[in-house]
């Protein structure tokens, strides 16, 4: 499993903007799962927050968010890879009402061959002559 280390930095150009040091994540093949782990280095003020990772696929679908673990990491699963690309962001919330999010980044997956439909449909008319041949006694 590979790990992508992503640093979230706070910019103060016009108010506070949180941004990832990697703008586009390249996450393996379409429909892959649990191949990559994302590890986030978060700003100091986020260390007391619950941090969730939100994905929006290219089609507009918004899968359930993932909560970062105690190491600020998540496994990339099919929430990300069911479609070739989309956007992502982190959301940090604490009990005192603090809410912050990163500027959305992009992710992309490379095209793969559709393995869900590669099995050939064999109709009875194709295999019947073969099975009868083997059942014939001399």
Question: Which residues fall in each region the model found?
Answer:
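N-terminal assembly/attachment segments of tailed bacteriophage virion structural proteins
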Residues: 1-116
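Conserved small/polar residues in nucleotide/adenosyl-binding loops
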Residues: 133-138
């Amino acid at each position: 499993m590979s790990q992508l280390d992503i640093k979230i930095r706070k910019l103060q150009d016009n108010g506070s903007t949180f941004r990832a040091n990697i703008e586009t994540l390249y996450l393996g093949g379409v429909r892959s799962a649990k191949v990559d782990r994302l590890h986030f280095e978060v700003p100091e003020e986020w260390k007391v927050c619950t941090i969730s990772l939100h994905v929006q696929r290219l089609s507009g679908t918004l899968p359930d968010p993932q909560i970062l673990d105690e190491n600020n990491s998540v496994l990339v699963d099919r929430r990300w890879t069911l479609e070739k690309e989309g956007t992502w962001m982190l959301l940090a919330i604490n009990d005192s009402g603090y809410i912050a999010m990163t500027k959305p980044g992009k992710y992309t997956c490379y095209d793969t061959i559709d393995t869900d439909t590669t099995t050939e449909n064999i109709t009875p008319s194709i295999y019947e002559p073969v099975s009868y041949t083997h059942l014939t006694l001399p």
